[in-house]
Amino acid sequence: MAMSFHRLPQALHMIPRNPTQSSKNLGFSSFLSCAPSMDSRISVSRLSLNHPGSKFGFSLDTRVRNEFIVRAEEGNTEAESEEFVAEIADTEGNVEEVVEAKPTRKPRIKLGDVMGILNQKAIEVAEKVRPVPEIRTGDIVEIKLEVPENKRRLSIYKGIVMSRQNAGIHTTIRIRRIIAGIGVEIVFPIYSPNIKEIKVVSHRKVRRARLYYLRDKLPRLSTFK
């Protein structure tokens, strides 16, 4: 290749110039005859740099070619990126369809929920048979209780409500009264079928939820008319 470049100027000097024939064409033909083993693309590109006005149309610059190649590569990468984004969107849509296709699970009912439902139903049935008034701590109530041994006889208990224990169908109240100077406390389940009637005689406002302090107070604080 080096020898061919040294022969190029000699060939140009040996060939006489003709005014009618352009020396550029002669230089191109002599160069091709002296260097037949060279790559035609490389020779044409280099000759076009030396002779920008060639009639053969080989005036494409290497920089333009590089820019063309880079632009082509950029176009290919953009097309590939668009295809990749489209594939990702398709896969996401398929995943969403699969997720939507799964059947929804029914909520599990725990044992505590079952017991709460049963208690609520039992309370509704008991209130239909015998309505229960609103009882609060400090109220004075009168309870008519049926004696199991003698169902014709009703025992009446009257006292002050010391506390109330909420437990669904097993809700209880504690009543205190003074009998012969001694404090007596009785616990009644308000939804018991043996209780025939519960009547609130009077309401009293108290600050505490449990009046256990009455055990240590004077009996007159636990008495009522």
UniProtKB/Swiss-Prot annotation:
Keywords linked to the UniProt accession: Chloroplast, Plastid, Ribonucleoprotein, Ribosomal protein, RNA-binding, rRNA-binding, Transit peptide
Pfam families referenced in this protein's UniProt entry, alphabetically: Ribosomal_L19
Highest taxon listed in the record's lineage: Eukaryota
The keyword Hydrolase belongs to this UniProt entry's keyword annotation: no
One of the record's GO molecular function terms: mRNA binding
Annotated transit peptide: 1-70
Primary location class: plastid
One example of a Gene Ontology biological process annotation: translation
GO cellular component terms attached to this protein's record: chloroplast; chloroplast envelope; chloroplast stroma; cytosol; ribonucleoprotein complex; ribosome
Subcellular location: Plastid, Chloroplast
NCBIfam families the record matches: rplS_bact
Family: Belongs to the bacterial ribosomal protein bL19 family.
Reported function: Located at the 30S-50S ribosomal subunit interface and binds directly to 23S ribosomal RNA.
Subunit structure: Part of the 50S ribosomal subunit.
Protein's name in the database: Large ribosomal subunit protein bL19cz
